[in-house]
């Protein structure tokens, strides 16, 4: 029997090439279970990186699909030792089967709490780790909100900045039923909502936003890298992250470390609920008027866009590699693994004053429901080291109130001149990125 990891793919995609390389480095085969994509050809490229693959007939994976795939793959000669899902909609499935297989992971209950933004806020508030007031929005009801406070609306279960916006007018809540219909109809993202389409409204935390890229092993927290969301664009019904920089440029080292310590305290409070293992993309803000840090979201997965390439540039480690390795790490190797993370951590470098590498990456988004006629990014100087165009001529963009990313680009930058670098690259991209619609 060949030792293997089972990768859960959504519609034929899931960082397959990178995870296959990580598995191979551990002398493990990578086998896949995928929901059926609209275009079967999507699987052609995916299968090249898998030792074997099972494809269901439905657009979403369920627990029974995983059970069946495990039996089929066992019959084909694979001993599945762990399950991995980079797609958030399958994160609970991953935990369910890792518990059965004996792989290291957080409990389903802890992950479910993180994925429920309303219950997570209430939990942190009760633990004295948040001061943000929150209300669940009941269908058809108008909440009694303090008119002197800014409020922010978002889905209880969210994805891709779907319908996240500042509530400028209480009448805007009348649009939520139409947005919920979008959520139910969104084939690509529907699985992430896990049949939850309700919304919350919470106090708007005014201040800069950041994300910590974090690995947890047996309750030990390692913040590998921190990104500042240097450019945020607010559209009518969504909030888009246009540029990220690591390390942060707008606040000093001591404040970054204060934020890191706050996140660690929040994770420690959740460890008792079973949040003890995994890779996390933790979004936080510094509430300037109250001089305190606030958790915005705890995403129990790797961050999207170019978070992983950026983290690997800064630390030398891929989050996908570390996540894969941690699932089956022998007890005797835990301390050495944690020592590696401590040595690689950008946060530890900031704590000790050691030099750190720096990156800037940006994302460009499209107009919902439009069709691409032309797209290009060909700067005559200072080209990005990584460039990913996600659409081509003729691509019809989804008519959806979520971020529809057209392009991601990453640059290595000078860590001692971040403000100038971000300002230049912002202008650089605005000048040389071109998209035309039909």
Which residues make up each language-model segment?
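Conserved ATP-binding module of the ATP-grasp superfamily
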Residues: 130-132, 170-206, 239-242, 264-273
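A short catalytic or substrate-binding loop motif that flags glycine-/basic-rich loops and adjacent residues
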Residues: 157-159, 204-207, 273-278, 354, ...
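ATP-dependent carboxylate/phosphate-activation module, predominantly the ATP-grasp catalytic core
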Residues: 203-206, 210-269, 275, 299-328
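Conserved metal-phosphate-binding beta-hairpin within the catalytic cores
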Residues: 214, 250, 267-311, 344-346, ...
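Peripheral (often C-terminal) accessory segments that flank ATP-dependent C-N-forming ligase machineries
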Residues: 126, 143, 324-438
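Phosphate-binding site of ATP-dependent enzymes
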Residues: 178-235, 254, 281, 285-294, ...
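A conserved helix-loop-beta module that forms one wall/lid of the active-site cleft
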Residues: 99-168, 178-189
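ATP-binding N-terminal substructure of ATP-dependent carboxylate-amine bond-forming enzymes
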Residues: 1-109, 329-333, 415-418, 423-438
